[in-house]
Amino acid sequence: MEDSTEDIIKSFTLEQSPEIKPKPKSKTSDLTDIVYAMDDDSIKMKKFTIFDDKYDQNISDSEHDLTPIKRKRQSAQSAPPPPATKFSSSIPQKPTLSPKKLATSPTKNYTDHINQLRSGPNSPKKYQDDENIRSLKYEIKRLKQEQNLKLENLQHKIDYLTNERDELQNQLTSMSFENDKLTKKNRSLSHENNHLTLENSKLKTKEYSNEELQSENNKLQRVNSTLRNERDELVKDFNITRDKLKKYYDLYLHCQKAHAKEMKKRIEVDGDKPISDKPMADNSTNQELVDVLKKLSEMMIEQKKISEPSAAVEKDTTSEDKTPPIPNTANSSDTPRMVSDFLEDFIKRVFEEMSSNNKNTLSPKQAINSQTYSQPNNFSNNTVPPSQSAAYNPSNSQPAPPPQPATNFYSSSTPNTNGYNQSSQSDERPETFELPHVAKDHWLQRPTSERSTQSTKYMKMDPEDIRKLVSVITDQLKKEQKSEKPSNVVEMETPVEKCQCCHGNPRNVTDTNNNQKLCQSCLNKGDFTMSEFMGRSN
C-alpha cells in the first residue's frame, strides 16, 4: 500500500513549468504577453482536470479519510503476486483497492463528499490551484524583470539616440553656415558670370575692330620696314658723300696750293713788267659789276634785318668763325676771274628762283632754298672760296679795301652748313665729316601773308639790272676764254674718259662747249680729276 500511495502522490505532483521561449518582437503592448501567459496556464489546467477525471473512479473514499485504516494481515495461504514481467517496472500499474467502509458514516451524497474532500486544505485540487496562483505570481515577476530590462535597454537606446541627435543637430547648424557661405559664393559667381558674359559679348562685337587694328598694325610694320630700308640706303649714301667730301676737300687744298705756286711763278717770270700790259677787264665793266653787287648787297641787308627777329637760323656753337685772310692782290688780272666765278654761281641761282617765281607758287623746299641763296656753299663749283672774292675791289689800279658788313655777303653770323669751318684755309683736313647741322626753319611757321610778301620782296629786282648783269657776265666769260695761258707754263694733257651716260664714247671733260656732265654712276665711283672739278662750272 505504501508503494501505491507513493505512486499516487508522485502522480499528483506538479510538473515544472517549461521555460518560456522568447516571443518575437512585436509592436503590441505588455498586456499581450500577459494574455499569452494566461493561455498557457489554461492549457495546463486542462491537463490536470483530465487527470482527475481519469483517476476519480478507481480511488475509494477511504483513502482520503484522515482516520487510520485497519488492514488485515495477509495469510500465508494467500496467493503470491503475479510474476513481474520485464516491462512491469516501467509501466505504472493502477492500485487494486477495494472500497472499504469507514468508521464514520458516509455522506448522504457522493458528490457532496467529493466536493468536501476537494475543498479541504490537503486536497490535490486546492494544491493545484495554489500552485497555479504561485506560478502566475512568479510569471508576473519574471515579466516585470524582463520589462525593466527592456526599459533599461530602451533608455540606453534613447540616450544614445539623443546624443546622436545632438551631434546631428550640431552638424546641421555647421552645414547651415556652410550652406549660407556657398549660397553667397554662388551669388558672387553668378554676378561674375554675368559680367563675363557681357564682356564676351563686347569682345565679340569688337572682333571686327580688332581685325582692322591688326591690319593697320601690319601696314605700319611694313611701312616701318620700308623706312628702315630707306634709312639704310640714306646712311650708305651719306657715307659715299662723306668720302666724296673728303676728296673734294683734298682737291680744294691741292688747288689752293697750286694756285699759290702759279702766282709765284707768274711774279718771278713777269718781273717788273707794268701791270697795264697784262690782260685786264675794262673799267666800265668793272664799275657796272660793282654797282650791281651793291644793289644785291643792299637787298640782302634788308632781308637780313627782316629775318633777324624770327631767329630763322641758329648759330653753330661748335664751329669757330674766323675772319678770312685777304688774298694777295699784286696781280689785278685775277680779280675779274674771281668775280666771274662767284657771279656765275650766283646768277644761276637767281635764274632758278626767277623761273620758280614765274609759276606763282613756292613749295616749302623752294622757300627754304630761297633763304640759303644768301648763304651759298663754300665749295659749290668754285675754285676759290667766295669769302675771298667778296673782299676784292674790281678796279684795276687800287687795291681792295678791308671788308665791310654792308658788302660782306658771307658774314660770320652765317651758320656753317658743310660740317667744317667754311673760312679756314689751312692745309689740315677736318677731323670729322658728319652730317651738317640743320637749323630749325622758322620761316615756314610764319603766316602765309608774311611769307609771300617777304619772298617777293627778296626776289623783287629790276629786269634791266638783271639783263645788264647777265650781259656783263657773258662778256667777262668770253674775255676769260680768249685770254691764253703764258708761254712758259706747260699745258697739261686733257684727260679723256669714258662714261656710261655717254654710251662708252670718249669725252673731253675740260671742253667748255661740251655740255656733257658726269652721270650718277660715275660720281658714285669717285672717278674725277682736278681738271674735271675745275670744269664743272661749265
Swiss-Prot record:
Keyword terms, alphabetized: Coiled coil, Cytoplasm, Cytoskeleton
Subcellular location as annotated: Cytoplasm, Cytoskeleton, Microtubule organizing center, Spindle pole body
Biased composition (Polar residues): 86-96, 104-122, 355-392, 407-425, 446-457
Protein name: Spindle pole body protein CSA6
Listed GO CC annotations: cytoplasm; mitotic spindle pole body
Span list, region Disordered: 1-31, 57-129, 304-338, 355-458
Gene null: resulting phenotype: Leads to an elongated mitotic spindle. Restricts localization of TEM1 to one spindle pole body in a large proportion of cells. Increases the level of CSE4 protein in the cell. Cell cycle arrest at the late anaphase/telophase stage with segregated nuclei and 4N DNA content. Simultaneous disruption of BUB2 partially suppresses the cell cycle arrest phenotype.
Its biological purpose: Plays a role in mitotic spindle pole body organization, possibly at the point of spindle pole body separation. Required for mitotic exit.
Compositional bias of kind Basic and acidic residues: 18-30, 57-68, 304-323, 426-444
GO-annotated biological processes: mitotic spindle pole body organization
Annotated coiled-coil segments of the chain: 144-237
Gene behind the chain: CSA6
Keyword Coiled coil in record: yes
